[in-house]
Amino acid sequence: MPWLQVRLAITPEQAETFEDALLEVGAVSVTFMDAEDQPIFEPDLGTTPLWSHTHLLALFEADTDETALIAHLQLLCGGTLPEHHVERIEDQDWERSWMDNFQPMRFGQRLWIVPSWHAAPEPDAVNLLLDPGLAFGTGTHPTTALCLEWLDGQNLDGCRVLDFGCGSGILAIAALLLGAPQAVGTDIDPQALEASRDNANRNGIDPARFPVYLPADLPQQPAEVVVANILAGPLVSLAPQITALVQEGGRLALSGILAEQAEEVRAAYAGAFDLDPTAIKDGWVRISGVKR
């Protein structure tokens, strides 16, 4: 059935007031959306982060009286509404619409990330089957893409790979499919470890080839290749630990870094690594190098 959709342009300070008001006047769903494609990083503990410019979308039953709705919202919110737009939208197959947003993606020369509902575009290529899920990492974000492209360009034969902050396991699984005999994953989120196991199983990876650990349980065995796609702050603060996990002569790739954060991260690793030129994609960077 069709719906009445109300879109409000709000600030984070207005979010709770308008969310409560929309629910009080009968909204069946309320959604916050980024109005300007702004990333959110490392929010303070106990906070719910919102973008500085946020769209609040609310859906109402199709027979809702639009004029009365807006008047009631104005009354509840104490006067003038912020910039807003009201439209009627047709119902659709929301699951199919969501699935259509995720298409097979190629990284480098050999590697494809393929959702399970799609046929592989190149059956003879290296195809990693992965669906969007609760853990971070599907290949759509520039930082994941930078790491996947880097892995595709490496000779991983005989290498043990460590995925530091493994999320969905996408980087470790890609490394295994690209020729690494073993990969290890670690993440602070137990749900991420479960997602990594599930995704490895979907790709036919023997669990013995891809053990995953919480950080406290991670064996302190240096690896030939380490990838860490997390955030700039942790990459800097954890530089001694990450450096120790790369064996001498081993290779390191770091991402989750904005371009303006690159120099700080490079400085944290320059003492132990011969660093490559910084790779940039859509305002994000990858820093890689070889341990001396």
Swiss-Prot record:
It is an enzyme of class 2 (transferase). Its main location: cytoplasm. S-adenosyl-L-methionine binds at T144, G165, D187, N229. Keywords: Cytoplasm, Methyltransferase, S-adenosyl-L-methionine, Transferase. CDD domains: AdoMet_MTases. Pfam families: PrmA. InterPro entries: Ribosomal_L11_MeTrfase_PrmA, Ribosomal_PrmA_MeTrfase, SAM-dependent_MTases_sf. The lineage of its organism: Bacteria, Pseudomonadati, Pseudomonadota, Gammaproteobacteria, Pseudomonadales. This is Ribosomal protein L11 methyltransferase. It comes from Ectopseudomonas mendocina (strain ymp). GO terms for biological process: methylation. It is found in: Cytoplasm. One of its GO terms (cellular component) is cytosol. Transmembrane segments: none annotated. Its EC number is 2.1.1.-. The keyword Cytoplasm applies. One of its GO terms (molecular function) is protein-lysine N-methyltransferase activity. PANTHER family: ELECTRON TRANSFER FLAVOPROTEIN BETA SUBUNIT LYSINE METHYLTRANSFERASE. It catalyses: L-lysyl-[protein] + 3 S-adenosyl-L-methionine = N(6),N(6),N(6)-trimethyl-L-lysyl-[protein] + 3 S-adenosyl-L-homocysteine + 3 H(+). Belongs to the methyltransferase superfamily. PrmA family. Methylates ribosomal protein L11. The keyword S-adenosyl-L-methionine applies.
